[in-house]
Amino acid sequence: MSEQVKRVRVTQVGSPIGRKPGQKETLIGLGLHRMNASRELAATPETLGRIRKVKHLLKVEELS
């Protein structure tokens, strides 16, 4: 009866240098601190909103 939580893998492909402070903070909030760093995160509405805010700096893959 329990639903599996959908997961996404995000990889930072763009640099935060020269970006607005909010975008830098969002990357840090996602746990990304350097180029080519990856994290697997639960696909909650909060996480997807953060990803949407910096989508131009990320590569996003859905995991099964």
Swiss-Prot record:
| Pfam families on file | Ribosomal_L30
Query: Matching InterPro entries, A to Z?
Result: Ribo_uL30_ferredoxin-like_sf, Ribosomal_uL30_bac-type, Ribosomal_uL30_ferredoxin-like
Return the SUPFAM superfamilies for the record.
Ribosomal protein L30p/L7e (SSF55129)
Q: Indicate the secretion signal residues.
A: none
Q: Where is this region: Disordered?
A: 1-22
Q: Does the keyword Ribonucleoprotein apply?
A: yes
Q: Which UniProt keywords apply?
A: Ribonucleoprotein, Ribosomal protein
Gene Ontology CC terms: cytosolic large ribosomal subunit
Keyword Iron annotated: no
GO molecular-function terms, A-Z = structural constituent of ribosome
Which example biological process does GO assign this protein?
Answer: translation
Q: Which domain of life is it from?
A: Bacteria
* Gene3D superfamilies, per database record: Ribosomal protein L30, ferredoxin-like fold domain
The similarity annotation says: Belongs to the universal ribosomal protein uL30 family.
- Subunit structure, per the record? Part of the 50S ribosomal subunit.
Check the record and name the PANTHER family matching this protein: LARGE RIBOSOMAL SUBUNIT PROTEIN UL30M, MITOCHONDRIAL RIBOSOMAL PROTEIN L30
- Per its record, how is this protein called by name? Large ribosomal subunit protein uL30
Native organism:
Acidiphilium cryptum (strain JF-5)
